[in-house]
């Protein structure tokens, strides 16, 4: 009788074989620039996580008093800006390419959900600055959030809560969604361009 570990391994191999998880070649159409936005989004996320980790280790006030801290804070900010820019370009590019074709709908939806989760992650980052800017954002945002009924468990005026959300909970959710998104892409393959004619060889099976 096989154990649960064997069943789990067999299930994983059946859904995502190693040669599919880590391929050594890609279709020729992947050389198009529109396919680069996904990789650029992941690259921005890596820089974002590394700079954020350094800022977290030094504490929330470090960047106010040290030039090196201000440097890493600037790196973190621009990584966020590029992350959202590349992700929006990636989402729009895949939407106009009809990336839900060939059973890829879950991959497209996971990317869209990741974008939605990244918004409050960035919002809590602005609330964690510990300056007048973060205070103004918190006071202006609380009324809108209270009107939505989330103020009881998500209080922008509570720095500790917002810092915890920004440092741990929301980044974990974003990384998990990105990881799931990559696995779905590996499983189904990257979406081919929309065929120009009925006999086009790029038509998915």
Task: Mark where each language-model region is.
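Membrane-embedded alpha-helical bundles that constitute the cytochrome b-like, heme-associated redox core
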Residues: 1-205
